[in-house]
UniProtKB/Swiss-Prot annotation:
Catalytic subunit of DNA primase, an RNA polymerase that catalyzes the synthesis of short RNA molecules used as primers for DNA polymerase during DNA replication. The small subunit contains the primase catalytic core and has DNA synthesis activity on its own. Binding to the large subunit stabilizes and modulates the activity, increasing the rate of DNA synthesis while decreasing the length of the DNA fragments, and conferring RNA synthesis capability. The DNA polymerase activity may enable DNA primase to also catalyze primer extension after primer synthesis. May also play a role in DNA repair. One of its GO terms (biological process) is DNA replication, synthesis of primer. Its cofactor is Mg(2+); Mn(2+). Belongs to the eukaryotic-type primase small subunit family. GO terms for cellular component: DNA-directed RNA polymerase complex; primosome complex. The active site is at 105, 107, 259. NCBIfam families: primase_sml. InterPro entries: DNA_primase_S, DNA_primase_ssu_euk/arc, DNA_primase_ssu_PriS. One of its GO terms (molecular function) is metal ion binding. Keywords: DNA replication, DNA-directed RNA polymerase, Magnesium, Manganese, Metal-binding, Nucleotidyltransferase, Primosome, Transcription, Transferase. This is DNA primase small subunit PriS. Heterodimer of a small subunit (PriS) and a large subunit (PriL).
């Protein structure tokens, strides 16, 4: 890798850990997702970068799994799109896109309560990601689109976010959704983000959401509930009230940190379920709506590959770090004995450390 023996040693050990994980995930537990209609899906992967290589495809599950076991990539992806020629370099037209999964990507940043560096994670920012998933589902996907929990696939990304796939049980509805083009997907996400909100003609869903928030801010809502022309009603309020109303609307519209490119890009790749996230070493893991709703899923516990939390290393960490808690154990730059789970996190974040004999 380079001329530094200590760095080489770390890289080789990390590579070995990823190989051990995939052998267990594939051969023992069958955790790794095999994208449906595999031969029409593009595969991408990365080692030191998110995506070093893409435009790959496999005709059989056997070939795909054999490749994953051999390469054991730090980052593993599949395309949302189904294509006639997934291994051709180029855009959707060259690849022959004929349908596409619809998925949301919630990717939160550090919150005001986080005390760590921007790239670190903690219970606060992970909790914010959870809250945003519930807002998306309960304020929009369930009431507006008639979906229920059986129609969704929720995946912890292995970092500060979740992927939410629309997978209706109704085959005709699924077929229609997967035939959506870029314009339909764009309209869908812009509606949820309130980008086309028309205060002269308020729809019922956004009206209900905003009335609820107005009540929290002690803004009288009776007249808003009876009219769709909110612009006129707002303009009739006092300056301070009017300012509070607009601030509340802007705050509600910015609640969701949705990656719009995931909805917009025809040939977007998403992380493969059952792989590891190369920046954190945490599992890309499918979870249930109820486990999220009832706060039963703890990413810093259930997202850790348990076998890696039992494999210990003596290390020397050469820079100051914010604390990180994995499976109830807290580590920082003063830690001298750490599990493989924390070692992968350090490596993924480019931390300067050395494995000791």
């Amino acid at each position: 890798m380079n001329d530094n023996p200590a760095t080489d040693k770390v890289f080789k050990e990390v590579s070995s850990l990823y190989k051990q994980y995939f052998e267990y995930a594939i051969l023992v537990r069958k955790w790794l997702e095999i994208p449906d209609d595999l031969s029409h899906r593009e595969i991408g992967y990365g080692m030191l970068k998110k995506v070093d290589n893409r435009n790959m495809s496999f005709n059989t599950e056997r070939d795909y799994l054999a490749w994953v076991l051999k390469e054991s990539p730090f980052h593993l992806y599949k395309s949302l799109s189904y294509m006639e020629y997934p291994d051709i370099v180029g855009g959707a037209a060259k690849k022959g896109l004929f349908k596409r999964e619809v998925a949301f990507d919630i990717d939160t940043h550090k919150t005001e309560k986080c005390t760590h560096d921007d790239s670190w994670i903690c219970e606060e920012c992970l909790g914010e990601a959870r809250n945003q998933v519930l807002i998306l589902i309960e304020d929009f996907l369930f009431p507006d689109f008639g979906l229920d929990e059986k129609d969704l696939k929720i995946v912890f990304t292995g970092n500060r976010g979740y992927h939410i796939y629309l997978k209706p049980e109704d085959p005709e509805l699924l077929k229609r959704i997967e035939k959506w083009g870029k314009n339909e997907r764009r309209y869908f996400i812009e509606y949820i983000l309130g980008k086309n909100l028309n205060l002269r003609n308020m729809g019922s869903r956004w009206k209900n959401i905003l009335v609820r928030e107005f009540n929290k801010n002690k803004i009288a809502t009776k007249k808003f509930e009876k009219t769709s022309d909110w612009k006129t009603e707002i303009d009739n309020r006092k300056d301070t009230t009017r300012r509070t109303i607009y601030e509340t609307i802007d705050k509600v519209k910015s609640r969701l940190e949705l990656d719009e490119k995931v909805m917009d890009d025809d040939i977007r790749l998403l992380r493969t379920i059952g792989s590891l996230h190369g920046y954190t070493g945490l599992m890309v893991k499918e979870i249930t709506y109820n486990s999220l709703k009832n706060n039963q899923f703890d990413p810093l516990n259930h997202g850790v590959f348990s076998k890696f939390h039992k494999k210990m290393y003596n290390v020397k960490i050469k820079q100051e770090l914010d604390p990180l808690t994995l499976k109830g154990d807290t580590f920082d730059h003063n830690s001298t004995e750490i599990p493989a789970s924390y070692l992968l996190f350090l490596f993924g974040h480019g931390i300067d450390f050395e494995i000791l004999e």
